[in-house]
Amino acid sequence: MLERESNFKARLLAVMRLKISTLEPYHEFAGVLFKTAADPHSPLNPFAHDSAPVRRDSIRLFEGLVRDTKARIPDELRAELPYLLWLYHMGIILFWIHDSSAKSARTYRLIEQTVELLDKLISLASNPLMRPVRKRALKLVSELRDLELAET
């Protein structure tokens, strides 16, 4: 599907739905895994040094999503967007872990709504009036990532 689609919103929606549907068979065990992964010293922690290969693979998926989209994305945001989308997807997974609705309906609804918001925010990011806000936000992301790298 992604090979044929160049619309950012459609691409992100497809990836996020696929991520959750792939995890769905493990939903009953997700809480137990989360307890381990939430430990900052656990090798299963998604931010841990030991998790770097898995994290990089996931970020690469988002790199492809961003690279092959027709959306107008400022260059400095385009460089950071795969990492930001990875963080976003981690938040969605955390929500899904706690979602007790039938067939994770609340999670899918959250994905639909947040992908819509992200698409609009990314469109707004190209506006010259948003440049100072965009620069400030990306500087913060860079600083946080530098701290993360220093700790691993």
Residue ranges and their predicted role:
Residues 1-32, 39, 49-53:
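Hydrophobic alpha-helical connector segments
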Residues 1-5, 65-75:
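Acidic/His metal-coordination segments adjacent to aromatic residues that form catalytic metal sites
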Residues 60, 98-152:
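C-terminal peripheral helix-coil segments that are non-catalytic and often amphipathic
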